[in-house]
Amino acid sequence: PAPETNYLRDP
């Protein structure tokens, strides 16, 4: 699976 959830994406 692709780790594109919100591990490094914090607005």
From Swiss-Prot:
Instruction: Tell me one GO biological process term.
Output: neuropeptide signaling pathway
Q: Name one GO cellular component term.
A: extracellular region
Keyword Secreted part of the UniProt annotation: yes
Please provide the record's keywords in A-Z order.
Answer: Neuropeptide, Secreted
Source superkingdom: Eukaryota
In which compartments does the protein localize? Answer: Secreted
The record's family statement is: Belongs to the FARP (FMRF amide related peptide) family.
Q: Tell me, what does this protein do in biology?
A: FMRFamides and FMRFamide-like peptides are neuropeptides.
- Name by which UniProt lists this protein: Extended FMRFamide-10
Q: What is the lineage of its organism?
A: Eukaryota, Metazoa, Ecdysozoa, Arthropoda, Hexapoda
